[in-house]
A protein has these predicted regions:
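Polar/charged heptad-repeat coiled-coil helices used as signal-transmission/dimerization stalks
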Residues: 179-185
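Transmembrane helix interruption/hinge and helix-loop junction motifs
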Residues: 96-102, 118-121
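Hydrophobic transmembrane alpha-helices and their membrane-interface boundaries in multi-pass
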Residues: 22-99, 106-113, 130
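Short, Lys/Arg-rich, polar N-terminal cytosolic tail immediately upstream
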Residues: 1-16
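Alpha-helical transmembrane segments and their interfaces in multipass membrane proteins
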Residues: 36-57, 116-179
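Membrane-interface helix-boundary signature
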Residues: 13-23, 48, 73-80, 119-123, ...
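Alpha-helix N-cap/helix-start motif
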Residues: 103-104, 125
């Protein structure tokens, strides 16, 4: 008689646990980068202690919420939603306060993990929200505050366009992964 192999990730609940753990790691990396960037900018005199402290407290709270919600039940989609809300708040504060493009692109780390969910709608919604956040920041910084000279403003617009393309690419990869999963079931 042939022995059946047991595959740990054949169970969808086990898959969700692994994906949520992967996403939590991605968010943690994002938050660590945010903390290091904000403190480094404080020590260079670019940001005040008040802003850096506030951002640090919010980032540490987001990290704790992310950790606790993922630890409580790793298979819940609720923990992903909570983590994303915290992410959006921190990403907005960083996109608004910092001109560096890498700060906006580092946010792609958690989005890469969404491919493992095989959920195009999730990628479209969360990616759309993140893209809209970047457009909103550009409207405020370029259109309302006139914070940049023309050349720099154009660079920010192209960076936002590139973020949109990256999200579209992640969506396309998720779509293909979803098709592969369906075809192999």
């Amino acid at each position: 008689m042939e022995e059946k192999k047991k595959y740990r990730f054949a169970d969808e609940k086990e898959q969700l646990k692994r994906v949520n753990s992967f996403l939590a790691t991605g968010y943690t990396i994002f938050y660590i980068v945010i903390l290091s960037v904000s403190w480094e900018s404080y020590f260079r005199g670019v940001r005040t202690l008040g802003y850096t402290g506030l951002l640090s407290v919010l980032t540490l709270i987001a990290m704790a919420i992310n950790f606790l919600s993922t630890r409580k039940d790793k298979s819940q989609s609720r923990s992903r939603k909570i983590a994303f809300i915290c992410f959006v708040v921190i990403a907005f504060l960083m996109a608004y306060a910092y001109d560096s493009y890498y700060v906006r692109f580092i946010a792609a780390i958690p989005f890469c993990g969404y491919v493992l969910l095989y959920d195009k709608k999730n990628v479209a919604v969360t990616g759309g929200i993140y893209f809209a956040l970047n457009v909103f920041v550009n409207i405020i910084r370029i259109g309302v505050q006139h914070a940049y000279p023309k050349e720099v403003a154009i660079d920010h617009i192209y960076a936002t366009f590139a973020i949109g393309l990256l999200i579209v690419l992640i969506y396309a990869i998720t779509s293909v992964a979803e098709q592969f999963k369906r075809d192999t079931e």
